[in-house]
């Protein structure tokens, strides 16, 4: 019996329709068919060890993993609602895949080399800081900074006291709770936080810093993870609350900033924005060499705030920076989250350190700093939700990458400058205070 030509035509049409349907599912702008092809390519490259140990290899792996894991986390019911959505899911899943050796160590080295070695993280953060600060109204920026910093610093001090008191109650002692939970969790991450902190402790105690670092590291990991989850929860629970600024930090300023015009992308200006952002990074780095006691990011933020306050940069350049920042955020945030999970979240170290007292103290830190910063934020004229996230939870996170994850989970990326401000300046203060305290508490 002969096949009717019309039926084969219908079959082909149906297949095309099905493919069309699948391709309409978009993962960060990429159709599912194209994504599946690239994912297979990545799996083959990793398993045959042909993934280049270069920027190209890192971008291919991190972007593909980051986008798909974020998409899954943003659509899974429990993660979406209670566990920080795509941000936490991406970080956790990549960390678990590394811990179970599904992702080989050489891929971790490639990813870490790109993010930390070549300092893509630095480019990402400076682009984000510059774009979010230049986007703000000049008067509003200065008003917000003056109110924000006291909230961040007082919150950190009061939280440390609360942690110490709870330490006494649960039997680990005031000194231990302060030195091994409060200080590392608020020190501003790993490189600028617990690494110098371990050196300070080692010098005062007359021991090696490696042993102390392994004691401090789990605190930063768990604190960071809890901060990300809490940021997602707070923004979700208080979605319709009057205390929610929906991304604006200063009370009563929401209506003003909503009227800000949308900047149309321009290819040449994108390149201009890149080099202006990098210029501010260089200013911060060079000033840090002259004054090594002050973190480079503190100088970067200060130089941008002063440039904005005195109107030193023409609007064309400001718009260019804003434009470039948007491109980086929209395309590379998920990749960066995957990089955090691959290279910074060591599940073995975290699980080995888990005791009920340790978990309780980390939880106390999160709850205390959220409540205190929200309350103080309200008193100082900030939106409590934004204050809790930027002046509170960001100061319990893993520095730059932690800030990105906390703000991604709460969908408040535009507040990166405030998160960095509290984290970097607050972290530096913590190191100074820890240096004094450790001599009495050791």
Swiss-Prot record:
Chain coiled-coil ranges: none
Pfam families: 2HCT (PF03390)
TM region positions: 27-47, 59-79, 83-103, 114-134, 151-171, 177-197, 209-229, 267-287, 293-313, 321-341, 349-369, 387-409, 421-441
Regulation acting on activity, per entry: The transport of citrate is unaffected by the presence of citrate in the growth media.
Reactions this protein catalyses: (R)-lactate(in) + citrate(out) = (R)-lactate(out) + citrate(in); (S)-lactate(in) + citrate(out) = (S)-lactate(out) + citrate(in); citrate(in) + H(+)(in) = citrate(out) + H(+)(out)
Location(s), subcellular: Cell membrane
GO terms (BP aspect): citrate metabolic process
PANTHER family: CITRATE-SODIUM SYMPORTER, NA(+)-MALATE SYMPORTER
Protein's name according to its UniProt entry: Citrate transporter CitP
Organism expressing this protein natively: Lactococcus lactis subsp. lactis (Streptococcus lactis)
Underlying gene: citP
């Amino acid at each position: 019996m002969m096949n009717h030509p019309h039926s084969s035509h219908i079959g082909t049409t149906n297949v095309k329709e099905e493919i069309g349907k699948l391709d309409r599912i978009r993962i960060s702008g990429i159709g599912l068919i194209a994504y599946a092809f690239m994912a297979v390519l990545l799996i083959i490259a990793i398993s045959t060890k042909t993934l280049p140990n270069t920027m190209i290899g890192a971008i291919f792996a991190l972007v593909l993993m980051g986008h798909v894991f974020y998409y899954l986390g943003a659509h899974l019911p429990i993660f979406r609602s209670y566990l920080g959505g795509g941000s936490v899911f991406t970080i956790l899943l990549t960390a678990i895949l590394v811990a179970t050796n599904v992702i080989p160590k050489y891929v971790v080295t490639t990813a870490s080399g790109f993010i930390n070695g070549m300092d893509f993280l630095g480019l990402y953060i400076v682009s984000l800081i510059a774009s979010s600060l230049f986007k703000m109204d000049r008067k509003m920026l200065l008003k917000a900074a003056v109110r924000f910093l006291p909230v961040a610093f007082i919150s950190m001090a009061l939280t440390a006291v609360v942690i110490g008191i709870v330490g006494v109650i649960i039997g680990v002692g005031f000194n231990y709770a302060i030195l091994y939970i409060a200080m590392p969790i608020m020190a501003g991450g790993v490189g600028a936080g617990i690494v110098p902190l371990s050196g300070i402790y080692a010098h005062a105690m007359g021991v090696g810093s490696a042993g102390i670092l392994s004691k401090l590291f789990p605190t930063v990991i768990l604190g960071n993870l809890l901060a990300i989850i809490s940021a997602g929860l707070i923004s979700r629970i208080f979605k319709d609350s009057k205390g929610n600024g929906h991304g604006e930090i200063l009370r009563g300023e929401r209506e003003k900033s909503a009227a800000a015009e949308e900047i149309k992308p321009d290819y040449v200006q994108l390149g201009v924005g890149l080099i202006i952002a990098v210029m501010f990074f260089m200013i911060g780095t060079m000033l840090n060499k002259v004054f090594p006691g002050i973190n480079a990011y503190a100088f970067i933020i200060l130089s941008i705030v002063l440039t904005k306050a005195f109107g030193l940069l023409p609007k064309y350049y400001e718009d260019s920076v804003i434009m470039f920042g948007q491109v980086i955020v929209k395309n590379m945030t998920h990749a960066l989250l995957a990089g955090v999970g691959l290279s910074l979240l060591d599940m073995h170290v975290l699980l080995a350190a888990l005791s009920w007292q340790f978990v309780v103290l980390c939880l106390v830190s999160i709850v205390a700093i959220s409540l205190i910063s929200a309350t103080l934020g309200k008193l100082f004229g900030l939106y409590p939700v934004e204050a809790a996230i930027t002046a509170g939870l960001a100061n319990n996170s893993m520095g730059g990458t932690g800030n990105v994850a906390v703000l991604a989970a709460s969908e408040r990326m535009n507040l990166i400058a405030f998160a960095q401000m509290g984290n970097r300046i607050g972290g530096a203060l913590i190191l100074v205070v820890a240096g004094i305290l450790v001599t009495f508490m050791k």
